[in-house]
Structures are given as structure tokens and as C-alpha cells.
């Protein structure tokens, strides 16, 4: 039964991820006043399947100087971790209702750093290594703010369980009292998933393609799938934390509909940002985090900690 539930979670994620690649290409196309893919199938709807078939029937490259075992493990581990992060996410019922669901997601996303590092190092190419080192520095840096923002929001929630966020947000979204944190969280998730304008890891003009420069065919497709799965996951997490849908036990389908709609809107915003903004310089990226986001998130975290203490002497309004 558990295996069946697991498949019912993974297969829709794979389908969503496949069509996200198509939506991105279509959206960028229309924003650049062109059509995007429109040949394979009606309106180009079968394009993701054609891409997948092309990539998986090609012969994978194994560079002579690479460390083969790490070179092959890295992409498969990246996709496995991308799927693992969905386990505690309530939609409205999680696959496994963990007591520390948020910590599990943070820990798993931290492990994803290793896949990038391994792929860059095992490729034995200077471009791949530079791309991997950039990606690792960027991901580790932005995880600091993600963790502090989560702590601040969870002080309002009173629990590390993701399901309790639904109960907390029955009357109002947490986005309203914590909107500065939500804005910083959204920008940090952009950096965490290596999306434009923070896609420094694959700066074409300087690093060719970043940490996956030596990958082709199947292993490259696995990295690609992991990236897009992470994008949907991060937006689903943002929806759960800041824009919790109302759960009516008599009609749980409405929760899923609302949850999906908000996740789609956030994902469309990710793609819109990619179409609109140029890439940051690396020093600007680090300056934004360590000089701007970190002091602000720490100050707001202190405010959230001290607020209940300040308000403790005020009698409740009955």
C-alpha cells in the first residue's frame, strides 16, 4: 500500500515537471514575441516527451579522466533527493506525517549541495569545478536565511509540523503579518534553486554550462529533472508556509485545488522573473545575502521572539 502511495506521489510530480519545461519555453517564447515549441503534437503539447525520448536514447558520455562512480551517482542522487523533499508536504495529507517535517526538508535540501559538488569534482573539468564551487557557496549561503525565516514564521505556528500550518492559517495567511520575511523567502528560494537572476552556476559566457558541462543524454536529463522538481517543491512549500489553503474536512478536494493554483501562480512568477531580469554579478549576489538579508532576518527573528514576551502582560480581549 505504501509503495502505491509513493507511486501516486512521484508520477504526478514527474508529469508536472515535464510540462513545466514546456510552460517555461512557451512563456519565454511569448514574452520574446515568438511562438515557442509548437510542432510536436497539438500546440507542442508532446514536446516534453519528445525531449525525454531524445535524451534517454542518446549514448551517455563518460569522460576518460572523470571519477566514474561519483560521476554517475551525482545525478541519480540529485533526483532522489528532489523527490524525497515531497514526503512531508501536506496536500492536504502528507505521505509521511513527520513531527519535524520542516527540518527534514531543510536537511534534505542541504544534502543536494553534495550532488552539485560531486558532479563538478568528478567531471575533472575546470569549468565544471568552478560552477560547482559557485553553486555550493550560493546554496549554503542562502540556506542560512531560509532557516532563520523558517524559525521566525514557525514561532507564530508553534510547531515544526507542516500540517499544523494549515490550522494556523485558517483565518488569515501568514503572508500578511510576515510579508517582509515572505519577500526575502521568495528571493532566497530563487537563489536556492539556481534560477535566474541567480543562475551564476551556469554563466554561459564564462563557464559554458556550469557544473553539468561534461554531462550528456540521461545523466544530464536527471539533473534537469531535479532542478525543475525542486522549483515546484519550493513553490509548494512557500504556499504551505505563507499562503495556507483552508481545509474543509467535508471537501478536501478544494484544499488541493487551492494549493495547486497558488503553487502554479508562484511557479509562473519564477518564469516571469527569468524572462525579465538580467543575471546578478557574483559579488552582488553575496552582498545581497550577507549585508542585506541576514541582518534583516535576524532583526525580524528577534522581534518575533520578543513579541510574545512583550504582550504577555496585556490581558486577553474576551
UniProtKB/Swiss-Prot annotation:
Highest taxon listed in the record's lineage: Eukaryota
Top class in the EC scheme: translocase
Subcellular location, record wording: Mitochondrion inner membrane
A GO molecular function held by the record: NADH dehydrogenase (ubiquinone) activity
Pfam families: NADHdh
Membrane topology according to the record: Multi-pass membrane protein
Family stated for the protein in its record: Belongs to the complex I subunit 1 family.
Protein name per UniProt: NADH-ubiquinone oxidoreductase chain 1
UniProt organism field: Tamias sibiricus
Amino acid at each position: 500500500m505504501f509503495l502505491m502511495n509513493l507511486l501516486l506521489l512521484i508520477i504526478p510530480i514527474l508529469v508536472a515537471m515535464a510540462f513545466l519545461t514546456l510552460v517555461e519555453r512557451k512563456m519565454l517564447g511569448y514574452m520574446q514575441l515568438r511562438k515557442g515549441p509548437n510542432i510536436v503534437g497539438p500546440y507542442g503539447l508532446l514536446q516534453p516527451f519528445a525531449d525525454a525520448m531524445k535524451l534517454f536514447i542518446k549514448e551517455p558520455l563518460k569522460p576518460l579522466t572523470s571519477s566514474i562512480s561519483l560521476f554517475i551517482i551525482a545525478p541519480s542522487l540529485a533526483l532522489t533527493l528532489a523527490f524525497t523533499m515531497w514526503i512531508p508536504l501536506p496536500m492536504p495529507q502528507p505521505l509521511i506525517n513527520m513531527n519535524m517535517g520542516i527540518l527534514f526538508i531543510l536537511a534534505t535540501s542541504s544534502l543536494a549541495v553534495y550532488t552539485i559538488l560531486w558532479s563538478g569534482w568528478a567531471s575533472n573539468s575546470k569549468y565544471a569545478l568552478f560552477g560547482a564551487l559557485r553553486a555550493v557557496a550560493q546554496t549554503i549561503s542562502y540556506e542560512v536565511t531560509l532557516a532563520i525565516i523558517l524559525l521566525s514564521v514557525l514561532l507564530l505556528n508553534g510547531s515544526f509540523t507542516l500540517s499544523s500550518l494549515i490550522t494556523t492559517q485558517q483565518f488569515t495567511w501568514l503572508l500578511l503579518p510576515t510579508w517582509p520575511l515572505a519577500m526575502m523567502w521568495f528571493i532566497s528560494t530563487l537563489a536556492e534553486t539556481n534560477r535566474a537572476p541567480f543562475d551564476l552556476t551556469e554563466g554561459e559566457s564564462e563557464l559554458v554550462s556550469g557544473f553539468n558541462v561534461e554531462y550528456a543524454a540521461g545523466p544530464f536529463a536527471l539533473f534537469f529533472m531535479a532542478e525543475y522538481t525542486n522549483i515546484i517543491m519550493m513553490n509548494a512549500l512557500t504556499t504551505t508556509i505563507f499562503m495556507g489553503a483552508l481545509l474543509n474536512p467535508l471537501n478536501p478536494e478544494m484544499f488541493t485545488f487551492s494549493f495547486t493554483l497558488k503553487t502554479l501562480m508562484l511557479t509562473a512568477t519564477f518564469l516571469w522573473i527569468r524572462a525579465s531580469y538580467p543575471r546578478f554579478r557574483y559579488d552582488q549576489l553575496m552582498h545581497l545575502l550577507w549585508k542585506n538579508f541576514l541582518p534583516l532576518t535576524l532583526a525580524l527573528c528577534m522581534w518575533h521572539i520578543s513579541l510574545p514576551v512583550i504582550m504577555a502582560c496585556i490581558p486577553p480581549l474576551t
